[in-house]
């Protein structure tokens, strides 16, 4: 897992918090998500880190979005982690956001080709 989010390192807390606040105000039915690859993962890098995710999207549907963005073939596995935990694929992104959003207002998701942290769920 990343020692720290690159997005967090590149943008100070106040800037991130203000941006997430603006996003939530302008798009109340969307969730501001930052997606980053796990440090030692062999899967491809994602072309874009910031996403505005519909609240009613499931974790499984968002995994599909990530798969498409990194052009991962169907036979390769991908795992996403929120706070080093694998969220249930059927859970709504809005629920994960409410439980696990960062104090800056973003939800941070790390993806990997390996199940690095075991199979525990949120």
From Swiss-Prot:
Q: In which tissues is it expressed?
A: Constitutively expressed.
Q: Name one GO cellular component term.
A: cytoplasm
- Lipid moiety (Phosphatidylethanolamine amidated glycine) attached at 118
Pfam families from the xrefs? ATG8
Which Gene Ontology terms describe the biological processes this protein takes part in? autophagy; cellular response to starvation; protein transport; response to ethanol
State whether keyword Aminoacyl-tRNA synthetase applies: no
Could you state what the record's PTM comment says about this protein? The C-terminal 4 residues are removed by ATG4 to expose Gly-118 at the C-terminus. This Gly-118 forms then a thioester bond with the 'Cys-558' of ATG7 (E1-like activating enzyme) before being transferred to the 'Cys-258' of ATG3 (the specific E2 conjugating enzyme), in order to be finally amidated with phosphatidylethanolamine. This lipid modification anchors ATG8 to autophagosomes.
- Site feature Cleavage, where: 118-119
Its membrane topology: Lipid-anchor
Going by the UniProt record, its keywords in alphabetical order are:
Autophagy, Cytoplasm, Cytoplasmic vesicle, Cytoskeleton, Lipoprotein, Membrane, Microtubule, Protein transport, Transport, Ubl conjugation pathway, Vacuole
Protein family per UniProt: Belongs to the ATG8 family.
Q: What does this protein do?
A: Ubiquitin-like modifier involved in autophagosomes formation. May mediate the delivery of the autophagosomes to the vacuole via the microtubule cytoskeleton.
Q: How does it assemble?
A: Interacts with ATG4. Interacts with SH3P2. Interacts with ATG1A and ATG11. Binds to ATG1A and ATG11 on autophagic vesicles.
Q: What is this protein called?
A: Autophagy-related protein 8e
List the source organism.
Arabidopsis thaliana
What broad taxonomic lineage does this protein's source fall under?
Answer: Eukaryota, Viridiplantae, Streptophyta, Embryophyta, Tracheophyta
């Amino acid at each position: 897992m990343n020692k720290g989010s690159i997005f967090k390192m590149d943008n100070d807390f106040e800037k991130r918090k203000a941006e997430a606040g603006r996003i939530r105000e302008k798009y109340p039915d969307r969730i501001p998500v930052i997606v980053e690859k796990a440090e030692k993962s062999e899967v491809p890098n994602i072309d874009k880190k910031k996403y505005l995710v519909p609240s009613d999207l499931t974790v499984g549907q968002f995994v599909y979005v990530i798969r498409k963005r990194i052009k991962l073939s169907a036979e390769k596995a991908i795992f996403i982690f929120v706070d080093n935990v694998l969220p249930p694929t059927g859970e709504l992104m809005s629920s994960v956001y409410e439980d696990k959003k960062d104090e800056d207002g973003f939800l941070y998701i790390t993806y990997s080709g390996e199940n690095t942290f075991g199979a525990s769920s949120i």
